[in-house]
């Protein structure tokens, strides 16, 4: 789709969206990297932390169904979600001494966070070229890395993490609110959203789900897996950083690749990700091969993510709802199931299992391609 705004407005949007992504994902970094340790430090058990962090993604999975049948993601709802995200960070702080109260506040916080990102992604896809989108989206990765490096070196008092979470949520609210005026997409209605169908392209959605299940072992156990091989935490930190550097590089230079067939790109990225997990299984104690596998994060995450949201944007008329379902099915349900499965199979064969799951994700994509071709052929014959 061609950009809908003139060059000056595109630049303004790109600038503000870059700031939104930077601070949004910096906040995600605080929430994902530091808050679990904070909860442990203030007296939560590992089981309680596990429940808290498994419940929030599941809410993100349920949220799109609410928007499909009851609510439409309008600019007003988006603005309210930004405001609530900020206010709920204070509620997290106030309820941190009580597990059940904190769990409820965390569920609401996860829901609010899950509303704003699909809204901005949809505007970005309708406003920017695929090449320009990557150069804007990479600021999210930079924000994530920046907060990890900064807070990792200065965080001495656990509760101070709440201050950073609130501050970043507020700055995200400020820049996010400025993006509303760039929303040129026709508003979806509850009636049109009800016609949205996961079953129509079920094999595609199954593939997205399985892909993130395959990432479960990496996100939750990569550090533990490598330390078990005798790799130091310092080296593991560099491994994580190297993967993000490769991710940022791909987001910046991926433009020409995205002019090709998006479904073919997804199939290629899924296959490469399976190879990545096989490398970790075959060479668990090789630092060099682990760095090679980390370089593939550029394809398995950065290229895959951009190709996915671009493909979904073309596949459905309900643009915002489709992006919400991507976040919910893949990172919500897939992330939750992936974490649980990885915990059950953790051991020497962890990444062999992840590779097999990812190969099934690739097979589902090929099935989707065949089904879509049949559907197109049948439509032409009518």
Regions found by a protein language model. Name each.
Residues 57-65, 143-148, 236-258, 335:
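Transmembrane alpha-helices of Major Facilitator/SLC transporters
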Residues 61-75, 155, 249-262, 346:
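Helix-to-loop junctions at the C-terminal end of transmembrane segments
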Residues 319-347:
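A late C-terminal transmembrane helix in Major Facilitator Superfamily
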């Amino acid at each position: 789709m061609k950009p809908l705004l003139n060059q000056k407005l595109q630049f303004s949007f790109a600038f503000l969206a870059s700031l939104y992504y930077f601070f949004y994902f910096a906040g995600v970094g605080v929430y994902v990297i530091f808050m679990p340790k904070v909860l442990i430090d203030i007296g939560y058990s590992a089981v309680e932390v596990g429940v808290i962090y498994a419940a929030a993604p599941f809410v993100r999975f349920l949220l799109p169904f609410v928007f499909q049948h009851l609510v439409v993601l309008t600019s007003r709802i988006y603005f309210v979600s930004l405001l609530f995200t900020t206010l709920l960070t204070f509620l997290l702080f106030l309820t941190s001494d009580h597990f059940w109260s904190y769990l409820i506040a965390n569920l609401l916080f996860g829901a609010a966070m899950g509303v704003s990102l699909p809204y901005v992604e949809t505007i970005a896809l309708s406003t920017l070229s695929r090449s320009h989108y990557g150069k804007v989206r990479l600021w999210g990765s930079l924000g994530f890395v920046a907060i990890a490096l900064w807070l990792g070196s200065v965080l001495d008092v656990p509760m101070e993490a709440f201050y950073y979470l609130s501050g970043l949520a507020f700055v995200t609210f400020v820049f996010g609110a400025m993006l509303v005026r760039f929303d040129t997409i026709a508003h979806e209605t509850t009636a049109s959203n009800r016609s949205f169908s996961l079953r129509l392209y079920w094999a595609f959605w199954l593939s997205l789900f399985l892909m993130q299940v395959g990432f479960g072992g990496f996100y939750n156990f990569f550090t533990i897996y490598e330390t078990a091989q005798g790799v130091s935490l310092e080296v593991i930190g560099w491994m994580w950083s190297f993967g993000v550097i490769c991710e940022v590089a791909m987001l910046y230079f991926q433009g020409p690749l995205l002019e090709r067939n998006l479904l073919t790109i997804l199939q290629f990225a899924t296959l490469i990700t399976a190879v990545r997990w096989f490398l970790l299984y075959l060479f668990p104690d090789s630092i060099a091969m682990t760095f090679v596998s980390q370089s593939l994060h550029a394809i398995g995450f950065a290229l895959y993510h951009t190709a996915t949201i671009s493909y979904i944007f073309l596949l459905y008329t309900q643009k915002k709802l489709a992006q919400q379902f991507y976040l919910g099915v893949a990172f919500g349900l897939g992330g939750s199931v992936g974490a649980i499965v990885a915990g059950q199979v953790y051991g020497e064969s962890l990444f062999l299992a992840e590779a097999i799951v990812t190969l099934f994700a690739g097979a589902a994509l090929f099935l989707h391609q065949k089904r879509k071709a049949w559907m197109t052929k049948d439509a032409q014959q009518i």
